[in-house]
A protein has these predicted regions:
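N-terminal, polar/charged subdomain of small-to-medium soluble alpha/beta proteins
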Residues: 1-113
Length: 113
C-alpha cells in the first residue's frame, strides 16, 4: 500500500487480524482512487453503555488532493446491537469507498468540462 495508513485503537485489542483487515480494506480504497494522500482509521469501544446498536466507534478520515477531506464513520448506538467489530469496520470502509468513488467521478467530470 502506498497510502500513508495510520491506525489508532482505543479500548479494543489490536490484533494482527484486525490490522490485516484494515490494511486490506485500505488497499481496496486505493484501487478506487490512486491519489489518496492519507488514511487514518480510528477504532474504539467507548465506556458508556449503549442500549441499542453497536458498542463500537469506527472512523475513517481520508485526504484526497487537491483539498478534499472525506469522513466515514459509525458511532455507538448505530447499526445492529450485536454486530461484530469486523462487520462494523467493513461497513464503514464500504461507506468510505462509496464517498471516494463519488468524488473521483466528480473530479473526472470536472476535468472533462
Amino acid at each position: 500500500m502506498y497510502v500513508p495508513l495510520e491506525i489508532s485503537v482505543k479500548d479494543v485489542e489490536k490484533t494482527k487480524q484486525l490490522e490485516d483487515l484494515i490494511r486490506t480494506k485500505a488497499e481496496k480504497l486505493e484501487r478506487a482512487c490512486d491519489h489518496i494522500a492519507g488514511c487514518h482509521v480510528s477504532v474504539e469501544k467507548p465506556q458508556e453503555h449503549v442500549k441499542s446498536g453497536t458498542p463500537y466507534r469506527v472512523r475513517i478520515d481520508l485526504t484526497v488532493p487537491p483539498s478534499h477531506e472525506l469522513v466515514a464513520k459509525q458511532e455507538p448506538g448505530q447499526g445492529e446491537m450485536h454486530e461484530e467489530l469486523d462487520q462494523v469496520i467493513r461497513h464503514v470502509f464500504d461507506k468510505a469507498e462509496r464517498q471516494l468513488k463519488k468524488l473521483v467521478s466528480k473530479q473526472r467530470e470536472a476535468s472533462h468540462s
